[in-house]
Amino acid sequence: MEEDRCSIKDDATQLIGNTPMVYLNNIVDGCVARIAAKLEMMEPCSSVKERIAYGMIKDAEDKGLITPGKSTLIEATSGNTGIGLAFIGAAKGYKVVLTMPSSMSLERKIILLALGAEVHLTDPSKGVQGIIDKAEEICSKNPDSIMLEQFKNPSNPQTHYRTTGPEIWRDSAGEVDILVAGVGTGGTLSGSGRFLKEKNKDFKVYGVEPTESAVISGGKPGTHLIQGIGAGLIPDNLDFNVLDEVIQVTSVEAIETAKLLALKEGLLVGISSGAAAAAAIKVAKRPENAGKLIVVIFPSGGERYLSTSLFESVRHEAENLPIQ
């Protein structure tokens, strides 16, 4: 008899990746393609951004740029990358300083502080450039600090090329035809998409952005409610050679689809997951995609959006439940 092998991980960072995929069954009326969701809320701290947080930190360590217990990691974030950095920083011994628009959800701020991060909030009207400028200002005043720069750091898409893409190919037994993913930094779509296109020359990649801020489609930056995508700029890490088409989704569509995922699929996801699902359903209804398999990335779980408009109606109901 083979000796039992211990499968206990050395630390929490070894739990990153290998997230499951599941078919959507109950919100796909009218779809001629199958849709499978890759559940990135199953990461240790509930988002896809933990992959790139680990990838960027390891890359900097390998290059001798940072040292645990000595270096400070500084980053501009809408929340989830910051949470990934804070979680890994806690596990490895790094101080983490983050800049974030004040409009991001309360849950994000609480989680970051609970993980020991230092958080600086900026005026949301200044957009992504506002948090980048603040991060650069902090970095300039702190020796032994580094900005990881997720929007342009090549280890971001490379992490998805090494992990997310191969996982999708493996777990679909090579049957996947289409990838749908929201565009924040562009890393998930570009890295995973490049790997999958190398495996299948006919593979298609669809990006998702808010209708209200459709910059990648040639529009102007605007205000929207889909936290994590639609940053109001074209990120350096977005590879247009990988991207086949951009699907626009309104904030209302994203929120309503996220609600349906909870009510009909039992999947409590964030607003950007709702946006990705709404886009995937649009693609799955196209006649040319009959019989194909679409994989859609669900970037984060719903718990960190409880204070947002996504759960406004049920939050009000919960606060007014009668005592019987």
Swiss-Prot record:
Organism: Arabidopsis thaliana
Record GO biological process: cysteine biosynthetic process; cysteine biosynthetic process from serine
CDD domains reported for this sequence: CBS_like
Alphabetic keyword roster: Amino-acid biosynthesis, Cysteine biosynthesis, Cytoplasm, Lyase, Pyridoxal phosphate, Transferase
Disruption phenotype: No visible phenotype.
Binding-site positions, pyridoxal 5'-phosphate: 80, 184-188, 272
Key word Ribosomal protein present: no
Pathway assigned to this chain's UniProt record: Amino-acid biosynthesis; L-cysteine biosynthesis; L-cysteine from L-serine: step 2/2
Protein localization: Cytoplasm
Protein name: Bifunctional L-3-cyanoalanine synthase/cysteine synthase D1
Family: Belongs to the cysteine synthase/cystathionine beta-synthase family.
UniProt function note: Acts as a cysteine synthase. The cysteine synthesis reaction is more efficient than the cyanoalanine synthase activity.
Keyword Coiled coil annotated: no
